[in-house]
Amino acid sequence: MNGTYNTCGSSDLTWPPAIKLGFYAYLGVLLVLGLLLNSLALWVFCCRMQQWTETRIYMTNLAVADLCLLCTLPFVLHSLRDTSDTPLCQLSQGIYLTNRYMSISLVTAIAVDRYVAVRHPLRARGLRSPRQAAAVCAVLWVLVIGSLVARWLLGIQEGGFCFRSTRHNFNSMAFPLLGFYLPLAVVVFCSLKVVTALAQRPPTDVGQAEATRKAARMVWANLLVFVVCFLPLHVGLTVRLAVGWNACALLETIRRALYITSKLSDANCCLDAICYYYMAKEFQEASALAVAPSAKAHKSQDSLCVTLA
């Protein structure tokens, strides 16, 4: 299987005019809204916030990854008219894939950081620091970019938005599936542990109880965004791998499903930006509440709200 390419579905995907127009509108809205929200987020992170925290470093890198992916969307729009496998298309596809899986990796890092802060607040003082967060981000960038460059040098091509399936094989599926399902397991585990810890924490007053509820809601919201945006695409890739390479009629349907779910995953760029403010506020509050007395925690909350305003 490793050395056999699929011979089915060699023609480019064609869409009815109404559906193609819908793609144009959807991607156009994502591009404009995503650029505005992520640019604003970067401005706040870099110019308006006073202290570089672990969460701020992760979210700054996430905003950069989302902006890089958004910059490839004009090429996605162009691919609806021209699917030629040009060097520019392949470069754009590489940037697109790099930042998709970088976003997945950073969301996973944020989930782990959140887990350590809430479940192990005393140990977190030694495990968490801005320098360590920056090192984690640097390692993730190197790993994601390096793996994609290695696949390109080996001549293993993934469909991406230049969606031509004539060269998909087992190897081309291994990276995206491994690059999602392992992070998914980590994100689900960390999220459930954090929610459990928050639910078991006895509130000392109304303010602490409200902060805990907000933090728990944000965990569920982040997990929901991650699953809704990325799971359908990778389930489709899994199905494609499972059905084999000669079921031509079924593969044509899967190709269309993969294209649609790939565009759905792009919505993560906008949804991430909406979550930035709440992620910074609620989880720094939750971490403060975990290790500080009530009065001191309220003071920390008030100071943090002023900083983010």
Swiss-Prot record:
Disulfide bonds join C89-C162. Glycans are attached at N2. CDD domains: 7tmA_GPR35-like. Keywords: Cell membrane, Disulfide bond, G-protein coupled receptor, Glycoprotein, Membrane, Phosphoprotein, Receptor, Transducer, Transmembrane, Transmembrane helix. Changing T307A: About 75% loss of ARRB2 recruitment. Multiply phosphorylated in clusters of serines and threonines in the C-terminal tail. Phosphorylation of Ser-300 and Ser-303 is mediated by GRK5 and/or GRK6. Coiled coil: none annotated. Belongs to the G-protein coupled receptor 1 family. Interacts with GNA13. Interacts with ARRB2. This is G-protein coupled receptor 35.
